[in-house]
C-alpha cells in the first residue's frame, strides 16, 4: 500500500507490487581487468589456427560426408563466423550438385546444414529411409548417430515438410529409449539434444556445452579445431566481460535499484539476452545498445505491470508518445526518473551513431517503443478493470507487448550493415518477424500463467483461450504450443532463399526466438527467476573461462 497526497487530503493508492527477488550478481561484473598479454597471445595463435582451418575447409577431393561433418563441427565449436563465405560457397556447390548420400547420418546432416543456410533442399532426401507405408524403417533404430542427426534435422522443418513430422516422432522415441545405454560422449549429446535441440538453442550456450562436454571427449577430435575453439571462446569472453562491465557501470550510475525498487534488477540477464542475439566481435556496439534497451524496457514493463495506477500510466503513455522532455513535469516523481533516462538514452544513441552518419535510424526504434508503451497501457487497463478480451483482441495487443518488434528493430541500430531499406522492410512486420514475436508471446504466456493467475491477472492468453474455446488449462497450453510450432515453421520458411534481406539481418530475428526457448525452458520464467535457468548459462559464458 502506498499513499499519495491529493490537495489537502491523503489518498491511499493500492499498487500491484510484485515483490521481485534482487539481482543474483551484486557488483560482481562491475569491474573487469584485462590481461593484455594473454589476449594478444590468444589473438596471435588464433590467426595461425584460422589459416590451418581454412586450408582444411578448402581441401579438394574430400568425401561429401567428411565435408559436411567438418562444417558441422566448425559451426558447433563456434568458430564458423571466421569462414562464412567459404562455408556458404561449399554448401552452394553441394546444393547445386544435388549430391545424395545413402546413409541416414549424412543425409540428415546435409539437409539440416543446407536448410539452416537458406538452401531449399527437398525433404524427399529422406524417402529412401521409409517403408511402403511411409514409416521410417525400424532397421534404423540402432543407428543412433543417424537418429540424432535426423532428430536435429526435423527442427528446421516448414509447413510443407510432413515427412519431418514423422522423422521427429520416430527419432525422439528411439533416442529416448536408447539414451541411458549409450556410451559417452554420445549419451550426453543425445540427452542434451532431447532437452534442447540445436536449431532452437542459443549459439553461445550450445558452443560452450559442445566444446567442454562433447568434443573434448571425442576420440576422433581434431586438436587444431579444439584448440582454436577454446582460444576463440576465451578471447571473445574477454570482450564480453568488458562490455558487461561497461553496461553494469551505466546501470549502477542510473541507480534504479534505489529509486525504482519495485522493478526487476536484471541487467546481467539482459546482457545474456543481447549476447544471444549476436556474440561475434563486430557486433560489440550493437550488443551494448541492445542490452541497455532491454534493461530500460524491463523497467517500463514493471512500471505498468507492478506499480503504476491507471491515471499515472495514461499520463506516462501520453508523455512517451509526445517524446518531449518538457512533458516530464506532468509525471509523478518516480516516473520522471525513467522518462528522463529513456530520452537521455536515445540522445546518446543518436550521438554515438552520428559519427557513422547513422543517427537518423534511431527514429525507427523510438517509434517501436511508443507502440510498446501504448500496448502496455491497454494491457494494464484490462488488468485493473478486470476485462478479459477475446483471444484475437488479446493477441493483437499482446504481440506488441512481447517487445520483440521493438527489440528486433533496436538490434539493427549498431549493425553497420543494416540499411534504411532493412528498417523499412522490418517496419512492415514481415512474416518471419511475426513468427518470432508469436513464439515469444505464447512461450512467455505458458511459462508465466500460474504466477500471473496468482496475482489476479485474468486477461492472460491462457485464460482468454480457455474461455473462448471452452477448454481446460492443459488444452489451452497445448493450443499455444501448437501456435509456437507453427510459428517455428514460418520462421524456418523465412530463411529459404531468395530472401528480401540478407541472412545477417534474418539471424537476429531467429536468435531472438532462440533466446525465448532457452529462457522459458520447462515452463520456467528464467528472466524473473534466473537462479535455475539462466544462472548456469551466465556462469558458463561470462564467469568461467575454458581451460586450455
UniProtKB/Swiss-Prot annotation:
Keywords: Cytoplasm, Lyase, Magnesium, Metal-binding, Plant defense. Pathway: Secondary metabolite biosynthesis; terpenoid biosynthesis. This is 5-epi-aristolochene synthase 3. It comes from Nicotiana attenuata (Coyote tobacco). InterPro entries: Isoprenoid_synthase_dom_sf (IPR008949), Terpene_cyclase_plant_C1 (IPR044814), Terpene_synth_N (IPR001906), Terpene_synth_N_sf (IPR036965), Terpene_synthase-like (IPR050148), Terpene_synthase_metal-bd (IPR005630), Terpenoid_cyclase/PrenylTrfase (IPR008930). Binds 3 Mg(2+) ions per subunit. It is found in: Cytoplasm. The keyword Lyase applies. It catalyses: (2E,6E)-farnesyl diphosphate = (+)-5-epi-aristolochene + diphosphate. Catalyzes the cyclization of trans,trans-farnesyl diphosphate (FPP) to the bicyclic intermediate 5-epi-aristolochene, initial step in the conversion of FPP to the sesquiterpenoid antifungal phytoalexin capsidiol. Produces germacrene A as an enzyme-bound intermediate that is not released by the enzyme, but is further cyclized to produce the bicyclic 5-epi-aristolochene. Pfam families: Terpene_synth, Terpene_synth_C. The keyword Oxidoreductase does not apply. Its cofactor is Mg(2+). Gene3D superfamilies: Farnesyl Diphosphate Synthase, Terpene synthase, N-terminal domain. PANTHER family: ALPHA-HUMULENE_(-)-(E)-BETA-CARYOPHYLLENE SYNTHASE, OS04G0344100 PROTEIN-RELATED. Belongs to the terpene synthase family. GO terms for biological process: defense response; diterpenoid biosynthetic process. Disulfide bonds: none annotated. The Asp-Asp-Xaa-Xaa-Asp/Glu (DDXXD/E) motif is important for the catalytic activity, presumably through binding to Mg(2+). One of its GO terms (cellular component) is cytoplasm. It comes from the Eukaryota. Mg(2+) 3 binds at residues 444, 448, 452.
Amino acid at each position: 500500500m502506498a499513499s499519495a497526497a491529493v490537495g489537502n487530503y491523503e489518498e491511499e493508492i493500492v499498487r500491484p507490487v510484485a515483490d521481485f527477488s534482487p539481482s543474483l550478481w551484486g557488483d560482481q561484473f562491475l569491474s573487469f581487468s584485462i590481461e593484455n598479454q594473454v589476449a594478444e597471445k590468444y589473438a596471435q595463435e588464433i590467426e595461425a589456427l584460422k589459416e590451418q582451418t581454412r586450408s582444411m575447409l578448402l581441401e579438394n577431393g574430400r568425401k561429401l560426408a567428411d565435408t559436411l561433418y567438418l562444417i558441422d563441427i566448425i559451426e558447433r565449436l563456434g568458430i564458423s563466423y571466421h569462414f562464412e563465405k567459404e562455408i556458404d560457397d561449399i554448401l552452394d556447390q553441394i546444393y547445386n550438385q544435388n549430391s545424395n548420400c545413402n546413409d541416414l547420418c549424412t543425409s540428415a546432416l546435409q539437409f539440416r546444414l543446407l536448410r539452416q543456410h537458406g538452401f531449399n533442399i527437398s525433404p524427399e532426401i529422406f524417402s529412401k529411409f521409409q517403408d511402403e507405408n511411409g514409416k521410417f524403417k525400424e532397421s534404423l533404430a540402432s543407428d543412433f548417430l543417424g537418429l540424432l542427426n535426423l532428430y536435429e534435422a526435423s527442427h528446421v522443418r516448414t509447413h510443407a515438410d510432413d515427412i519431418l513430422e514423422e522423422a521427429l516422432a520416430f527419432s525422439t522415441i528411439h533416442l529416448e529409449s536408447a539414451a541411458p545405454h549409450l556410451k559417452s560422449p554420445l549419451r550426453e549429446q543425445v540427452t542434451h539434444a532431447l532437452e534442447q535441440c540445436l536449431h532452437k538453442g542459443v549459439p553461445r550456450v550450445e558452443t560452450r556445452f559442445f566444446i567442454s562436454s562433447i568434443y573434448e571427449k571425442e576420440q576422433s577430435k581434431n586438436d587444431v579445431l579444439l584448440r582454436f575453439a577454446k582460444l576463440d571462446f576465451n578471447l571473445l569472453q574477454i570482450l564480453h566481460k568488458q562490455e558487461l562491465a561497461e553496461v553494469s557501470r551505466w546501470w549502477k550510475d542510473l541507480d534504479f535499484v534505489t529509486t525504482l525498487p519495485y522493478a526487476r534488477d536484471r541487467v546481467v540477464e539482459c546482457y545474456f539476452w543481447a549476447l544471444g542475439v549476436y556474440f561475434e566481435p563486430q557486433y560489440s556496439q550493437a550488443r551494448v545498445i541492445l542490452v541497455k534497451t532491454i534493461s530500460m524496457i524491463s523497467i517500463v514493463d514493471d512500471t505498468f505491470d507492478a506499480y503504476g495506477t491507471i491515471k499515472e500510466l495514461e499520463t506516462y503513455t501520453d508523455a512517451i508518445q509526445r517524446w518531449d522532455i518538457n512533458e516530464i513535469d506532468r509525471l509523478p516523481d518516480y516516473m520522471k526518473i525513467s522518462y528522463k533516462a529513456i530520452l537521455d538514452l536515445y540522445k546518446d544513441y543518436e550521438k554515438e551513431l552520428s559519427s557513422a552518419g547513422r543517427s537518423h535510424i534511431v527514429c525507427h526504434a523510438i517509434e517501436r517503443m511508443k507502440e510498446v508503451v501504448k500496448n502496455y497501457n491497454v494491457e494494464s487497463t484490462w488488468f485493473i478493470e478486470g476485462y478479459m478480451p477475446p483471444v484475437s483482441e488479446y493477441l493483437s495487443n499482446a504481440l506488441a507487448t512481447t517487445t520483440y518488434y521493438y527489440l528486433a528493430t533496436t538490434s539493427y541500430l549498431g549493425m553497420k550493415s543494416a540499411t534504411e531499406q532493412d528498417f523499412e522492410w522490418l517496419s512492415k512486420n514481415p512474416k518471419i518477424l511475426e513468427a518470432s514475436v508469436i513464439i515469444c508471446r505464447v512461450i512467455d504466456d505458458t511459462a508465466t500463467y500460474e504466477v500471473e493467475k496468482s496475482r489476479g491477472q485474468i486477461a492472460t492468453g491462457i485464460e482468454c483461450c480457455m474461455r473462448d474455446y471452452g477448454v481446460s488449462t492443459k488444452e489451452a497450453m497445448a493450443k499455444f504450443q501448437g501456435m509456437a510450432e507453427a510459428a517455428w515453421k514460418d520462421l524456418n520458411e523465412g530463411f529459404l532463399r531468395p530472401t528480401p534481406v540478407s541472412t545477417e539481418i534474418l539471424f537476429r530475428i531467429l536468435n531472438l526466438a532462440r533466446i525465448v526457448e532457452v529462457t522459458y525452458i520447462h515452463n520456467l520464467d528464467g528472466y524473473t527467476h534466473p537462479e535455475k535457468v539462466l544462472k548456469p548459462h551466465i556462469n558458463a559464458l561470462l564467469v568461467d573461462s575454458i581451460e586450455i
